[in-house]
UniProtKB/Swiss-Prot annotation:
Protein role: Odorant receptor.
Top-rank taxon, per record: Eukaryota
Residue spans crossing the bilayer: 28-48, 57-77, 102-122, 142-162, 199-218, 239-259, 275-295
One GO term describing the cellular component: plasma membrane
Sugar-modified residues: 5
Cystine pairs: 99-191
UniProt record similarity statement: Belongs to the G-protein coupled receptor 1 family.
Residues in the Cytoplasmic compartment per record: 49-56, 123-141, 219-238, 296-311
Gene3D superfamilies in UniProt: Rhodopsin 7-helix transmembrane proteins (1.20.1070.10)
Topology in membrane: Multi-pass membrane protein
Lineage: Eukaryota, Metazoa, Chordata, Craniata, Vertebrata
Gene Ontology molecular-function annotations: G protein-coupled receptor activity; olfactory receptor activity
Record topology, Extracellular segments: 1-27, 78-101, 163-198, 260-274
Name used for this protein in its record: Olfactory receptor 52J3
Amino acid sequence: MFYHNKSIFHPVTFFLIGIPGLEDFHMWISGPFCSVYLVALLGNATILLVIKVEQTLREPMFYFLAILSTIDLALSTTSVPRMLGIFWFDAHEINYGACVAQMFLIHAFTGMEAEVLLAMAFDRYVAVCAPLHYATILTSQVLVGISMCIVIRPVLLTLPMVYLIYRLPFCQAHIIAHSYCEHMGIAKLSCGNIRINGIYGLFVVSFFVLNLVLIGISYVYILRAVFRLPSHDAQLKALSTCGAHVGVICVFYIPSVFSFLTHRFGHQIPGYIHILVANLYLIIPPSLNPIIYGVRTKQIRERVLYVFTKK
């Protein structure tokens, strides 16, 4: 069914296939996805609870970690429950407006995650390269400003995607070979010119690349400062403060780069591999981030044990 809007036809609903080629295995696939989603919910909720309860965890690093956990909860919840609805209840149809809203939220929260990782890199840079000025540089006003940038820039970058989708005519095609709605997945169903959609998508990706470059530059300075320290123990201690952040960066960027490369150049790779990678990209980082910080950050590890064992 279609409705007419200023000479542009939009479908009332889209049909999300799920994982094309693996429809018969949806029920089996749902188990691991549900388990990982529950780990993401429990892990990030625990991080937020510990940071809220423990007054000693008030450093900027934990402030950014709380933001990261909030974004991870939002990102995974935006995509996984809808996906499980497809796997468990054959709830394939999604309203046109709901599909565009899901697209906006997924892209916006993904952008926010990239922004908060950049902010955390700046925090580690100041902590290692200018430790005596840490408190004077990362003041509460600066933290508020960084927090606003974390939210505002991805939202501003994602909003044009909504317009670029609404301007497109959709003649008869309404089947999306995916388990969630994303920008180019919707655009490719259009019978209009989607060149501007592709160009803008690459423009947005360039900001992810820029963030990664800036993170890399910050770690060049961090490593230079670390290797100038007089003792081996001091070097290890300084590097250990960055270990969790490096792990989270790898968890976020490696799947995203792999997903991008397989989508752009892996034309011989089966379609279900593309979709599985895209799904893992949205659920693996939110589930692993709290585990990485719980294992690698002494304060978090000790406080988690304290909060859940104290009487």
